[in-house]
Amino acid sequence: MKRICSIYKSPRKNEMYLYVLKADGLERVPEGLLPFFGTPVHAFDLVLSPERKLAREDIAKVLENLDSQGYHLQMPPPDDDYIEHLPEELLRRNDPA
């Protein structure tokens, strides 16, 4: 079951991608998703098959979503920037001398 897929990147969120069947284009993408995603920017086209490996997505889930809902939304990886790092002197403040 090979699928020719168009992948679009989000102009609003770095590393967020939208996979759609090339033949369908964006017509099956829900209207409510586009304000969140932004105006899709075409990144590239790709032939997807169960044997193909994807860097950050499960190919079986992508193909299932394409068949059932007409699109797959790849969310960006978790951002670790929200973790605050304490200065070394604060980390050692309660250490025994």
Swiss-Prot record:
Residues 3-87 form the YcgL domain. Transmembrane segments: none annotated. InterPro entries: YcgL-like_sf, YcgL_dom. PANTHER family: PROTEIN YCGL. HAMAP family: UPF0745. This is YcgL domain-containing protein PSEEN4034. It comes from Pseudomonas entomophila (strain L48). The lineage of its organism: Bacteria, Pseudomonadati, Pseudomonadota, Gammaproteobacteria, Pseudomonadales.
